[in-house]
Regions:
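Aromatic sugar-binding surface patches on proteins
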Residues: 84-108, 221-228
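Short acidic/polar inter-strand loop motif in beta-rich domains
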Residues: 115-117, 124-135, 246-253
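Bacterial N-terminal signal peptides
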Residues: 19-30
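Short, compositionally biased P/S/T/A/G/V-rich stretches that sit at domain boundaries
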Residues: 142-187, 262
Length: 262
C-alpha cells in the first residue's frame, strides 16, 4: 500500500513540475540574455610621404571611423603624439612586418563596438595646425569583432608640404618674400639633411586679381626650412602672392596664398 501511495503522489506531482518547467522556458524566451558589442581596437596613424608620423607638432589629425554600409559613426578622435624615431623610420632599412612606431609615436586608438564583420571607412584630415596644407586621406577595411589592429596599425600616407608665408615691403618699395617649408609632419628641410634643400623648388608668384604679374624663384635662406627672395619689384599695392613648394623626387607639393601688405 505504501508503494502504491508513493507512485500515486509522484504521478500527481508530475504535472506540477511540467508547469514549472514550461514557465521557466517562457521567461527565458521572453527575456533573452543581452549580448553587448565587443570593443575592437583599430590604431590609426598618419605618415607624411617620405617623412615621419604626423601628430601634435603640426596640430594633430582628425579621424572619423564609420560603418561604410550604414553610415553610422563608430569612432571620432585625434591623432596625437610624437613624430617617431627618425633613425628607425628614415635611416634604417625595414624588414617585412617590422614595426616602426613606438609608444610615443602619434596615433589614434579607435574603439569600435561591432557584433559582426564590418566594412569600415576611415577618414583622416590634417595637419589641423596648418589649414592651408590640410588634406583628407581615406581608406576602407574589414574589421572583425575582437580582432584588434594594433602596432603600426592602419597607416594613412599624406602627400604635401606645409608652407608658412610672409611678405615685407622694403624701404625702396621692393618686396621681400619669405616662406617656411616643412614636411607634413613638421620635419625641417636643410642642405645635406634627410630632407635636402636641393631636392625642393620654392617659387613665388605675384598675382593681380588672379593673374601672374611677377615670378620669383626662392633660395634657401640659411636657417632650417627658410626660403626667401629679397628684391622683387612690383608696381602696385593690394596684390597677393602664391607660394608653391614642390619636391623633385616625390609627389609632395604645397600651395598657399597671402595678401601683400602695403
Amino acid at each position: 500500500l505504501a508503494i502504491i501511495s508513493r507512485r500515486r503522489m509522484m504521478c500527481e506531482m508530475t504535472p506540477l513540475f511540467a508547469r514549472i518547467a514550461v514557465g521557466v522556458l517562457a521567461v527565458a524566451v521572453a527575456c533573452p540574455t543581452t549580448v553587448s558589442a565587443e570593443p575592437t581596437h583599430l590604431m590609426v596613424r598618419a605618415q607624411s610621404v617620405d617623412a615621419k608620423f604626423m601628430g601634435t607638432h603640426t596640430g594633430g589629425v582628425a579621424v572619423t571611423v564609420t560603418d561604410e554600409r550604414s553610415g553610422k559613426v563608430l569612432a571620432k578622435g585625434m591623432i596625437k603624439g610624437g613624430t617617431g624615431d627618425t633613425e628607425r623610420i628614415m635611416e634604417k632599412a625595414h624588414a617585412r612586418w617590422q614595426v616602426i612606431s613606438d609608444a610615443e609615436t602619434a596615433g589614434y586608438d579607435a574603439s569600435l563596438d561591432i557584433e559582426a564583420p564590418t566594412l569600415v571607412r576611415v577618414d583622416a584630415r590634417g595637419p589641423m595646425g596648418a589649414s592651408a596644407a590640410a588634406i583628407t586621406v581615406s581608406s576602407t577595411l574589414w574589421m572583425l569583432p575582437g580582432r584588434n589592429v594594433l602596432g603600426d596599425g592602419l597607416v594613412l600616407t599624406f602627400p604635401g608640404l606645409i608652407i608658412t608665408p610672409a611678405t615685407t615691403r622694403n624701404p625702396d618699395g621692393t618686396l621681400r618674400i619669405d616662406a617656411q617649408v616643412t614636411m607634413m609632419c613638421g620635419c625641417p628641410i636643410t642642405p645635406g639633411g634627410i630632407w635636402d634643400a636641393k631636392d625642393y623648388t620654392v617659387t613665388g608668384y605675384v598675382l593681380d586679381h588672379g593673374h601672374v604679374v611677377a615670378t620669383a624663384t626662392m633660395h634657401y635662406a640659411g636657417q632650417p626650412s627658410q626660403f626667401t627672395f629679397g628684391d622683387l619689384k612690383i608696381a602696385r599695392n593690394r596684390l597677393s602672392v602664391r607660394l608653391v613648394a614642390s619636391s623633385n623626387l616625390t609627389p609632395n607639393v604645397g600651395v598657399v596664398e597671402t595678401d601683400i601688405g602695403n
